[in-house]
Every structure is written in C-alpha cells, then in structure tokens.
Amino acid sequence: MKAKMSGTVAAGFPSPAEQYLEPPLDLNELLVKRPAATFFVRVSGDSMIGAGIHDGDILVVDRSLRPASGDVIIASVDGEFTVKTYRRDRGGVRLEPANPAFPVIRIKPGQELDYFGKVTACIHRFA
C-alpha cells in the first residue's frame, strides 16, 4: 500500500508549516524488511502494555532475526504462544511481560521453548 506523505509534524514545539509533499510512503517498504521471513499477528491480552503493545494491535514479526536479550519476541512455551521480552543471562532464559499484573516466565530445564521471531513493529489504531 502506498499513501501520500505530507511532510513532518512537530510533536514538541510547533514548527513552520511545510508546503511540500514528500515521496509516497510505502507501508510494506517501511514495515517489512524481509518479506519471505515476515508475518503479522494480532495481540490478545494486555501483558505488554508497558512496551506500547495493546490488545488488538498487529505485530510485524521477522522469523529470520535471532533473539538478543531485551528483544520483544513471539515464542511458544509448552505449546502456548506468547509475546514477551526475551532475557538470557547466567540465570538462564526468561520471558518478561511489560505489565506487573503478569508473571515472568522462567524457562526450566526440560521445558519446551520455541522461538517464532522478533517483533519489529507494532501497528496500533487510536480510533
């Protein structure tokens, strides 16, 4: 999808009006870097609201990127899908929510953890 880009807008102090149009904005080009490895998934739940990911949002996920500690990922723990912040350190692997109402998932020896991709963008509608 391509849409007209109407310049920039100040989010702090007002800036002089810009009377020109930028080149068309291609949302696929903006959001999808590796089409063959990218999928979209709709969020169900509020465990990541502190990271700006809300119920009903659409996540852009790249399967080709390996997770690094601190990345938001899509994973399956014992067959249950989740979106969480991936943490790996000497204490092992854990999946952290961005909402204190939800528990941290600590991966125990023998527990099944499957990685499905790194979240690269979140599409959030205001209305």
Label the model's feature ranges.
Residues 94-100:
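Catalytic Cys-His active-site segments of thiol-dependent hydrolases/isopeptidases
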